[in-house]
Amino acid sequence: WYFSNDLPNYRFLETYKPAVSSKIYNNNGDIAADFAVQKRTFVSIDEIPDFVVNAFLSAEDKNFFNHPGIDAKGITRAIFNNLQNIVSGKRLEGASTITQQVAKNFLLTSDVSLSRKVKEAILAFRIEKYLSKKRILELYLNEIYLGERAYGIASASMVYFDKSLKELSISEAALLATLPKAPSTYNPYRNLNTTLKRKDWVLARMLENNFLSKNGYEKEIKKTIVLKKRKLNFYNESLFFT
């Protein structure tokens, strides 16, 4: 009861849409410039390919469609580990489901404390009662920070591959799914080998969760990842429109 007092209002999430970046198009219909401190492009959950969703579920919350906002096993494990961490003075660890991450990203601070984790769990439980799973997933995939100033998977797809979500391969989607855990550590422009190892781990989880067949896994694990950052040109056309 103590922690449930004075919690932020979560009902605005039903209609929330992030502020997206302003884009300038050349007269061929291509993006010539993108103005924003944070790169954002909102994509409806119905427009996100299943294999992209499955990559993130495998990496972040494989039980997303079966839990009520919190993962009891994960919380039990985190509580046990955190009791040891408190004694030893180590950083507290999380057990965040996707819904808990939505609660934290939209409604709470990022400080790591037991009180915030309790509030996060309460809010996650309430959000699950108020919003559909599809809406929660849509919020998460459009708001999650994925490095290089990219927020949301559509922006990250452009930042790392210069592709729309539908153009991604499964292995490329798996690479993007490595980023929420630690965007700086797994930034492929800085730590490619580390990121590729994590990408292979995500593909293995997709196989384990029956999102990939054995043949599909073997095909994707062998694919070479080619990074391609979108380079916007202000001068290649004389006529622009917004």
Residue spans for each PLM region:
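Extracellular/periplasmic catalytic domains that process cell-envelope and extracellular macromolecules
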Residues: 15-17, 25, 48-51, 130-132, ...
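N-terminal post-signal-peptidase region of extra-cytosolic proteins
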Residues: 7-10, 36-45, 59, 121
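Solvent-exposed loop/turn segments at secondary-structure junctions
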Residues: 31, 40, 62-64, 82, ...
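Non-catalytic, structured segments within soluble enzyme domains
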Residues: 90-242
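Flexible, acidic/glycine-enriched loop-and-adjacent beta/alpha segments
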Residues: 44-98, 154-156, 161
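Short extracytoplasmic
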Residues: 14-41, 47
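N-terminal type II signal-anchor transmembrane helix
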Residues: 1-25, 63
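Short, glycine-/polar-rich solvent-exposed loops and beta-turns at beta-strand/coil boundaries
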Residues: 16, 35-36, 68-73, 114-118
